[in-house]
Amino acid sequence: LNPKKKENNGVKNGDREKQHETGNTIFRGSPDKYLTEQGWMAQSDLGSRALVEDLVRYKLCQRSLVPEPSGAASCALHSAMRAAGDEFEERFRQAFSEISTQIHVTPGTAYARFAEVAGSLFQGGVNWGRIVAFFVFGAALCAESVNKEMSPLLPRIQDWMVTYLETNLRDWIQSNGGWNGFLTLYGDGAIEEARRQREGNWASLKTVLTGAVALGALMTVGALFASK
């Protein structure tokens, strides 16, 4: 007797697209796009991943590296992270641009670059401002990968960002109100209001971060990007 064929859930036999089941949810596509560790997926991971993917796409769109997405506008949390990232880049545009242009990344060195910068950025502790800097740096690394025709690195870099958030920063984020805590400080147009009042946004929102801290953390690892 021929063995009974298994239901393929609509995926053709010749299709290389794989299905990956986690709980009651089936994800279709490359496992790298959804999971960083087998069997590891929680609601908080999905929130962090969505936030990472939105900020990266937003920054790539700003650089005209990808087309503007169609559909609904981003949620309040995504809008707040976008505004915070823009404010960070605006305040430290020249120095940050110099750092970004020095990034020399290859598929073989990308993770080492990412890990060393992230480790240095949070060496002095964690706060929301440094988390914003982390997002901006990750997006810059993605942009550099696209510029160097290494677009396949994009899902990998985003995976690294999510993994770092959900392992190294998870406890701090949860103890500070989760992403709702971030939204309380940065949401509802808080950054735009601070800019209109000509206040230092990072100080007015009482993040621990200052320009010197954020920029200094990135500048201290500038040599990592300058290596040929």
Curated annotation (Swiss-Prot):
Stretch list, region Disordered: 1-29
Transmembrane segments: 207-227
Gene3D superfamilies in alphabetical order: Blc2-like
Extent of Basic and acidic residues compositional bias: 1-21
Recorded family membership: Belongs to the Bcl-2 family.
Residue ranges annotated as motif BH1: 120-139
Protein name per UniProt: Apoptosis regulator R1
Described function: Could be the homolog of mammalian Bcl-W.
Motif, BH2: chain positions: 171-186
MF terms in GO: BH domain binding; channel activity
Family annotation (SMART domains): BCL (SM00337), BH4 (SM00265)
One Pfam family hit: Bcl-2
Coiled coil: none
Protein's UniProt keywords contain Transmembrane: yes
Membrane topology qualifier: Single-pass membrane protein
Keywords: Apoptosis, Membrane, Transmembrane, Transmembrane helix
Gene Ontology, cellular component aspect: mitochondrial outer membrane
An example Gene Ontology biological process: extrinsic apoptotic signaling pathway in absence of ligand
Localization of this protein: Membrane
Keyword Transmembrane: yes
Tree of life domain: Eukaryota
